[in-house]
């Protein structure tokens, strides 16, 4: 393993192993497909069933329920996928399996029938479970013993995340809105497939890194067990187990019944208690049970661990509220954009937008293409087929971009696409992330609690702009013509809030968790 790591560090691109940039582009195509599909899902489902590009005419609550269910399982399945990769199949095989399943998922959604929509979403969920946790695991193994380089590696990797989100939303969104929804879903699948092939044929560059795990020697296990016994344990009591069972059962009932009742009109329980629906009742039971479990268990820790667990719980609560609000970028915000925002630009305003659109499209792509050329120079002789596939992917992207710009500049009327606003998040991250990094590295770096508070407050201000803009819309109105500036401000403040909370969130939470709780 050590030899493989040293060999990878011999061929460097921008000061890092070429293998990092193989992962960079693989992750970029996966995020392209994920954010591209997500950008058009709700507006497709809730779109009018007539017109040049008809949707399915779902009501908003049904569409958002499907999106929420998808998001829930997207965050749950990596637990299983990570375990399988760690113990059974290896990181690289998990990535390939996940990418293939997600390719099939996007292809299914492109067929545009309810059955294939559900099959597609199920495949995306399972594929994400295999793919998502194991990309960062490969990076972690790649930089074993080189901690001074690891932060820079993750920064580069997450630039790939933002690049993929930016390009995916822009192209899948435009193709879906202007040409056809199935083409938008299909485009996401095409690039997921190309990303899988690019990674598959580049595996030789990693050596044995990420291979199927070998059997762990018993002395390692014994040492680990001995170390853990030195920690003061907090064993589970019968009351703890009972509360856990009630929580799991109630949560599962809610997870299964809520989407079935809203999407499929299949209500497996069909009762109300104190005015609450069955799904809401079990969600409340699960929440209360979990709170009781925390109240019962936390006081049994030692004083230092207890204080850390209390702080950890509070910060987790803040994090849940933040991301629940932030994820509206895929749910309620596209509907707000479509139905309540004036997106028509005339005369000089239309021309200015076209120029801005050209610049924000072409400049990031030129930067990413430069990185591609650097990778080619270092690795073409070793992983030529992977690089050819990657080159073809970029040619397709550039062709779509040129066609998109040509169509937009030829149009006599300028209508800003609904999905265009969603790219602002990635754009603002690229612009402001260096400034926040300098702030965090300066003597004025605030404590984590202040950063969390700032993140939540700034996020709230973003929604405040939208609420202020909509204050004069009559109750029950189906459409309105609000200025686009309110949406731009909302996305700006949401991004600033994310930059306050997200980069340090996981790191800070990991420091709060007692050592005995880390597996």
Q: Over which residues does each language-model region extend?
A:
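Extracellular/periplasmic helix-loop-helix junction of adjacent transmembrane segments
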Residues: 44-77, 149-152
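A gly/Pro-rich, aromatic-decorated transmembrane alpha-helix motif that marks the paired
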Residues: 38-40, 79-80, 162-179, 461-468
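Hydrophobic core of transmembrane alpha-helices in multi-pass small-molecule transporters
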Residues: 28, 105, 116-131, 316, ...
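Primarily marks hydrophobic transmembrane alpha-helices of the MFS/SLC 12-helix fold
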Residues: 94-95, 452
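Glycine-rich segments within core transmembrane alpha-helices of 12-TM secondary carriers
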Residues: 74, 149-177, 184-199, 354-360, ...
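Intracellular loop-helix junctions on the cytosolic face of multi-pass helical membrane proteins
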Residues: 1-18, 22, 145, 176-409, ...
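C-terminal ends and interior cores of transmembrane alpha-helices
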Residues: 97-118, 398-408, 457-479
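Central cavity-lining transmembrane alpha-helices of secondary-active solute carriers
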Residues: 64-85, 132, 166-168, 423-438
